Amino acid sequence: MSKFLITFLFFCVMNSTAKPVQVNTTSPWWKGIAFYQIYMPSFQDSDGNGISDFKGMTSRLDYLQSLGIKGIWLTPFLTSPKVDNGYDVADYYQIDPVYGSMDDFNRFLEEAHKRGIKVIMDMVLNHTSTDCKWFKESRKSRDNPYRDYYIWKDQPNNWESFFGGGAWKYDSITNQYYLHKFDVRMADLNWTNPAVVNEIKKVLRFWLDKGIDGFRFDVINFLHTDDVTTDNPIKAGKQQHLYDINQHGIQKAISIIKSTVSEYPDRFTVGEVGSDQIEVLTQYQSPQLLDVVFNFNFGSIQAFSVERLFNELQSMEKNMPSYPTLFFGSHDNPRLMNRLANGNIQRAKALAALILTAKGVPFIYYGEEIGMQNITANTFDEIEDIQGKTFYQLARTAGKSPDEALADGNKNSRDKSRSPMQWDDSSNAGFTTGKPWIKINDNYRDINVRKELQDKSSLLYTYKSLLILRNKEKTLQYGSYEKLEKKNDMILFTRTFKKEKISIIINFGNEQSVRLPEGAKILMGNNLLRPNEFLIYKIVGR
């Protein structure tokens, strides 16, 4: 194995010419913590129905606290027919019974707060379920008071649903079409109607009064605030979503949302913006709009590339107006271990070091810390995701064989990353005593929390060590970049806060020997970096 001696003198303060803006000690709490995303059906079941619930999740708060998690993002848990696992809300004021009662939620929130853990909830404001009372009233007649809560037209344009097929559904009761940018059972709200805006304000205040610490707003740049008549252009036989997203007026809608949330002190807003283009993301991030956007700079990378990782990191630093979000996995993406780590535990550790030491707000997807992997459906009946089911059915309609359709369904299904949390090697991975709502990965006996807690060389132990370090070091929470560079297959950066500097070297290439500057204190790693190893060291008061 080759060695290459590098002296990182550019990290030394004496050679520094940069004058970074310092962050004061009153920085918002969300800048200093790492979030953990819990996909509601898949974390911990307490009653044997095969679906996670608040009682089960409460029983796992000690685990999250010991891991070093300071924030939790909950995917939707409101009453829903679950066409899209809760992203189709039927009642904004009720807990879905499969997750427990309002008392169960209140206790979960209380116990999380006792452990110093903030909780934000997913809020879907682009559409509701067609089971929602508002929609049921809306479709009764053209002059119903709820009619204009949704978008109804005599003739549809050419817009396509993001789940496949057309975006308009004919309703024979009133002889008009309603808009659904996603599934036909998820009708888009009309944000040009002041009554809708007032309803949303009431919903937000209800949950803020409950003590929720903030919201993650789903597909926030999809809100209908303008034109629904102009056709989308077609390029190379594929529709370009030009006029159905990022409409004029969305910023005003978001400013109303933000002003409502701001009535309550110290609350956090993050929006999912369906784009990986920085110029689109930055339109929605400001003190008057969203605190941060859930940007897909890392999440959109489909194959491992040091060059791409560095370019995205550099792009976020140069172009984002404030803190970016840092994440690799989510309920919409394939698992990190499959997509970028390619089954390599050491690379997964290096990628963890990247998002937990870089500038930004990190989000860890449940199970990522133990290296959970994708699942694949073996039959159509094993597909749970509406998107996967739709693409299967479209393939069959187009004349493809069942096997070809299953391949299409699996390719487009988001089930890959939604399998139950793997707690131990007991039946059903310790997730449930009943039949799980979705298949459990067959590798749970080898990949689980209990096993990795007993192994100091495990991926879980690395995540825990990194989180403890991040929680301790203000520089890793609030520090600005002094240096951000790539050398061969290494990503190197220094973050600075007040008089302190912490340097990070992540080696994705061949073995490297590092000569540290005088007075450097190693926080993690060592100065002989093998492939996929990292080094974190501090320089104080120089």
What are the functions of these language-model segments?
Residues 526-542:
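C-terminal beta-strand-rich structural cap/linker in extracellular carbohydrate-active enzymes
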Residues 136-176, 301-317, 397-441:
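Core domains of carbohydrate- and sulfate-ester-processing enzymes
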Residues 21-205, 209, 222-275, 421:
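Acidic/aromatic-lined carbohydrate-recognition and catalytic surfaces
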Residues 129-139, 262, 268-302, 372-386:
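Substrate-binding cleft/loops of secretory-pathway carbohydrate-active enzymes
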Residues 242, 261-264, 268, 284, ...:
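Loop/helix patches that line or flank the sugar-binding groove of alpha-linked glycan CAZymes
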Residues 4-12:
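Sec-dependent N-terminal signal peptides
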Residues 233-241, 323-342:
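Active-site clefts of carbohydrate-active enzymes
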